[in-house]
Amino acid sequence: VNSAIEVYFDNYLILDKEYSSTNTRNEDSITITKNTIILNNNNDSTMTLANYFLHGEHIIKAKLYFVNSGEKGNGTDFIEKEIVILDRSSKTPLIWTGDFKTEYYTYETIRIPFRVYDPNVTIAKVNLYKNGVLLSTREIAD
């Protein structure tokens, strides 16, 4: 029984790698650039992330599997991380969130960490709405 990993940039598969069960130290790393090849793209090995590696928020996610006789078994839940690619020539503001829970108890304070980048101003104004009702306003210094 071996182990395997799949890594996605947004929803594009960019790594599908199997590790031998005899290797007890399965550490690896991947560098994602606009030249990273998209796998399983109708056998077109020239398709890269160039058209998708753009200014904005993106999701990188990975999933681990056990592999038995070449067949992947059930995998773990995805491990996801939100990233931002910043193109300083773009004038488009960006807002991205950090890790937060999707369910809360009634008595809990809802905490949603976020970052703001607005190349047009030195202090960005952010309004938080719930069901169309303004809850709060914050000013974020760059």
Q: Where on the chain are the PLM-derived regions?
A:
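Surface-exposed, short loops/turns at beta-strand junctions within beta-sandwich domains
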Residues: 49-56
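Proline-enriched interdomain boundary motifs that mark the N-terminal boundary
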Residues: 89-98
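Aromatic/hydrophobic beta-strand junction motif of beta-rich domains
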Residues: 1, 112-118
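Short, solvent-exposed loop/linker segments at the N-terminal edge
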Residues: 102-108
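Solvent-exposed serine/threonine-rich low-complexity stretches and specific carbohydrate-binding patches
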Residues: 12-36, 131-142
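Conserved aromatic beta-strand anchor motif in extracellular beta-sandwich/beta-rich domains
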Residues: 7-11, 64, 128-130
